[in-house]
Amino acid sequence: MKIHHLNCGCMCPLGGAFYDGFSKGLHAHLVCHCLLIETERDGLVLVDTGFGQGDVREPSRLSGFFRVLNNIQRRESLTARARVEALGFSVADVRHIILTHLDFDHAGGLTDFPHARIHLMQQEIDTAQQRHSWLQRERYRPGQWSATSGWEGYQVQGERWFGFDAVTALNGLPPEILLVPLAGHTPGHAGIAIQQPQGWLLHGGDAWFYRDEMRQPQRHCT
């Protein structure tokens, strides 16, 4: 399987290195890191979707609070759809989307791929639909995903894998792609593991924000 690393959105909040760990100026620079996986028989698989075309054209889909706080850079050229098409593929080639979680900067592109099956933890679906707290109402934006279909929710169950519990394969996808529950950043947050010839790649979503968080003697993850 070939994996493309895509930046599908940009946010530049005030705070510099205090926010992202490395920026030199007043503003931090955060990317929406997505993966595009080319499979042999199951088409393209997109891991997270960043911001979508709807977010660029209709800013009201996003929380006004987070638009200001995160200084979201709305650029159509950075959407997952634009990135996929720039690689020579079509929207229809994306047959599966796997979400680490449903935050606005990860789920915004769902409506740009209307025929894709959507895989994520069932707990995340339930939490996003209920939106009990103010923060949940700001971070989970139904306008980004309420019109989509083909959702597949997964329970916390499965096999032990490299010290992680309840890791599971995904329906309709090769066994080299696994869903890894990583609750914390959100109740139904998950990582996506992809087996490659040289080893495993784990997309951790927002379980950590900066690579040095995983290099310190005492690791700090969200």
Regions found by a protein language model. Give the residues of each.
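Conserved beta-strand hairpin/beta-sheet module of binuclear metal-dependent hydrolase folds
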Residues: 2, 10-82, 192-205
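Core dinuclear metal-dependent hydrolase active-site scaffold
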Residues: 5, 22, 34-39, 156-196
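Active-site metal-binding loops of divalent metal-dependent hydrolases
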Residues: 9, 49-52, 102, 124, ...
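Active-site environment of divalent metal-dependent phosphoester hydrolases
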Residues: 14, 102-107, 186-189, 209-212
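Active-site metal-binding motif and surrounding structural segment of the metallo-beta-lactamase
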Residues: 60-120
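Metallo-beta-lactamase
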Residues: 72-89, 93, 122-181
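Short hydrophobic/aromatic-enriched beta-strand-loop microsegments
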Residues: 117-122, 203-205
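A hydrophobic, small-residue-rich beta->alpha segment in the mid-to-C-terminal subdomain
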Residues: 204-222
